[in-house]
UniProtKB/Swiss-Prot annotation:
PROSITE patterns: SMP. Residues 1-25 are lumenal. Residues 266-304, 426-469 are annotated as: Disordered. Residues 266-299 have a biased composition (Low complexity). The keyword RNA-binding does not apply. Keywords: Endoplasmic reticulum, Lipid transport, Lipid-binding, Membrane, Transmembrane, Transmembrane helix, Transport. This is Maintenance of mitochondrial morphology protein 1. Residues 47-469 are cytoplasmic. It comes from Pyrenophora tritici-repentis (strain Pt-1C-BFP) (Wheat tan spot fungus).
Length: 469
C-alpha cells in the first residue's frame, strides 16, 4: 500500500493580531502628526525671535546689497547715455539777462564752495541745535492740534477701510493713538557732493550737472503707537463660517539713521521760435480758452524740488502687541510681530530709502504784497483791500488784447468785461491811495482837496480830519 503524502495544514493566525497591527499603525500616525503640529507651534509660531541687533544687521546687509546693485546699473546706464549724446549740441538761447562766468546754467560746485568759504574736507560737522528747536516747535503744534478732537481717529479709520482690502479681513477700527512726547534730534550735519543715481527723476539719464547734498544724523527714542481691532473671517464653505477677533498695537520705540537732502533745480523745455500769429488766429484765440504754447512732444517743465532720502544703514525698532481669539486668547504671538515688522520695513524701504527718494515741490519765495503781515492795522487792511484778487494767476495768461481770459478769483465790480489790465491796476491804486488818505498816512493832493471841498459844501458837511474853512 502506497504511503500517503501528508498535506500541510495552515497555521491558524489569531484575529486579534491584524487588528492590533492596524491600531499600532493608526496610533503611530496620529502621534507623528501630533509631534509635527507641536514642533510647528513651538518653533514656528511661538519660537523666540532673533534679537533686535541681529535683525538690524541682516536688514542693513540686504539693503546695502540692493544699493550697490543699483549703483552699478546706474553707472552702466550713464556710460551709454554719454556715448550716445556726444553728437548733440544745444543751440544758444537768446536772453536779455546778461550771462555770468558760468554759461551752462549756473555755477559749479567748486565755485559755490569757494564763494561760501566752505571746505568739504576740512569743515567740521554742525550740531543743528537751532534746527532741532524749530522742528520741536512744529511737532508740538501738530500734536496739540491732533489732541483737540477725534478727527485723526476718524480719518485713520476711513483710510484703513478704503481701497482694496481682502474679503477675509473685517472692518478695521483704530482704538489707540499715541503721538509720543519726545522730539527727533538732528546732528552731525555735513555738506558733500551728491552721489550718482540718487537725485535724478524718472526719465533722466544723469547728464545733469552735479549737485550738493547735506547729510545729517537723526535719532528719535520715543513711543509712537497705533492700535487697531479687526476680525479674520473664514468664508468657506459659506461666508462668515468662523470669525476670529484680532487686536494689534504697533509702537515705534526708536529710529536712527542718516538723512540726505538735496535741491533739484527747475528745468524748462527748450524755447522754439514760434511763427507770427495771423489776425484770424488772434480772433480765434480770444474766443477760445487759452492753451499752453508748447507742443505735446516737448519735455514738461520741472519745478524746483527738495529731495530727501535715508541711507540704507538706518535702524527702526518696533514693538508689536497682539491678542488673538475671544475666549482662550493668544497673547503676543512672535510670528505675528515678525510679519508686521517685515511689512513696515518693506513699506518704508519702497518710499524713502536709497536709491528711492521723496520730492517736495518748493513754493515761490518771491515777496508778495498780500503775504505781508504786521505794522499798523490800517495799513494791513488797506493792503489787503488793494491786493484782493491781484494774484499771480491773474497775470499768468493774458490774451492778445490785454484782457485776462476765463474767470479768476478777482471780481472787480459789475462793469464792462472788456476792461484792460492797466485800468484794473489803476483802479486798485486809487483805492489804496484813498485808504491811505483816510488813515492819515498820506496827504491828499490839491485836486482831491478841491473836489472834497465841493462835496462838503454840497452836502453841508465837513470832511473829517480837514481844517475848517
Amino acid at each position: 500500500m502506497a504511503d500517503e503524502v501528508p498535506t500541510a495544514v495552515p497555521l491558524a493566525t489569531p484575529a486579534g493580531s491584524s487588528s492590533l497591527s492596524f491600531t499600532q499603525g493608526f496610533l503611530l500616525g496620529q502621534l507623528s502628526i501630533a509631534i509635527l503640529i507641536f514642533c510647528f507651534i513651538k518653533f514656528f509660531i511661538f519660537g523666540e525671535p532673533p534679537s533686535a541687533d541681529d535683525r538690524a544687521l541682516h536688514l542693513n546687509s540686504l539693503r546695502r546689497a540692493r544699493t550697490l546693485a543699483h549703483q552699478q546699473s546706474y553707472k552702466q546706464l550713464r556710460t551709454r547715455a554719454n556715448s550716445t549724446s556726444l553728437s548733440l549740441r544745444h543751440k544758444p538761447s537768446t536772453s536779455i539777462i546778461r550771462k555770468g562766468e558760468e554759461t551752462r546754467g549756473g555755477p559749479s560746485i567748486a565755485t559755490i564752495l569757494a564763494k561760501t568759504y566752505y571746505n568739504v574736507k576740512g569743515h567740521q560737522p554742525e550740531s543743528l541745535d537751532w534746527f532741532n528747536v524749530l522742528i520741536a516747535q512744529t511737532i508740538a503744534q501738530l500734536r496739540a492740534d491732533a489732541r483737540q478732537d477725534d478727527a485723526i481717529l476718524t480719518s485713520l479709520t476711513e483710510v484703513l477701510n478704503t481701497g482694496s482690502k481682502p474679503d477675509w479681513i473685517g472692518e478695521i477700527k483704530v482704538t489707540e493713538i499715541a503721538l509720543g512726547d519726545e522730539f527727533p534730534i538732528f546732528s552731525n550735519c555735513r555738506v558733500m557732493p551728491a552721489e550718482d543715481g540718487f537725485w535724478y527723476g524718472p526719465g533722466s539719464t544723469g547728464n545733469d550737472k552735479e549737485r550738493l547734498q547735506a547729510r545729517m544724523d537723526v535719532d528719535l527714542s520715543d513711543v509712537i503707537t497705533i492700535g487697531v481691532e479687526t476680525t479674520l473671517n473664514l468664508n468657506w464653505p459659506k461666508p462668515m463660517s468662523a470669525v476670529l477677533p484680532v487686536a494689534l498695537a504697533v509702537s515705534i520705540v526708536r529710529f536712527s539713521g542718516t538723512l540726505a537732502m538735496s535741491f533739484i533745480p527747475s528745468s524748462s523745455p527748450p524755447s522754439t521760435t514760434a511763427p507770427m500769429p495771423s489776425p484770424t488766429s488772434n480772433t480765434h484765440r480770444s474766443s477760445s480758452p487759452s492753451r499752453p504754447a508748447s507742443s505735446s512732444g516737448a519735455p514738461p517743465h520741472r519745478p524746483t524740488t527738495l529731495a530727501f532720502t535715508f541711507l540704507d544703514d538706518y535702524r527702526l525698532d518696533l514693538s508689536v502687541r497682539s491678542l488673538v481669539g475671544s475666549r482662550s486668547r493668544l497673547q503676543d504671538v512672535p510670528k505675528i510681530a515678525q510679519l508686521i515688522e517685515s511689512r513696515v520695513h518693506a513699506w518704508f524701504d519702497e518710499r524713502a530709502v536709497e536709491p528711492r527718494f521723496q520730492q517736495i515741490v518748493l513754493p515761490s519765495l518771491w515777496p508778495r504784497k498780500h503775504n505781508t503781515r504786521g505794522g499798523a492795522p490800517e495799513d494791513t487792511e488797506a493792503a489787503a483791500e488793494g491786493e484782493e484778487g491781484l494774484d499771480e494767476d491773474d497775470f499768468a495768461v493774458v490774451d492778445g488784447n490785454g484782457t485776462a481770459p476765463g474767470s479768476t478769483s478777482y471780481i472787480p465790480s459789475p462793469i464792462a468785461e472788456n476792461v484792460t489790465l492797466e485800468e484794473r491796476i489803476e483802479a486798485e491804486g486809487a483805492k489804496m491811495r484813498e485808504a491811505e488818505i483816510r488813515a492819515g498816512v498820506r496827504k491828499p493832493s490839491a485836486s482831491q482837496e478841491r473836489s472834497r471841498g465841493r462835496d462838503d459844501r454840497a452836502d453841508g458837511m465837513r470832511w473829517r480830519g480837514a481844517l475848517p474853512r
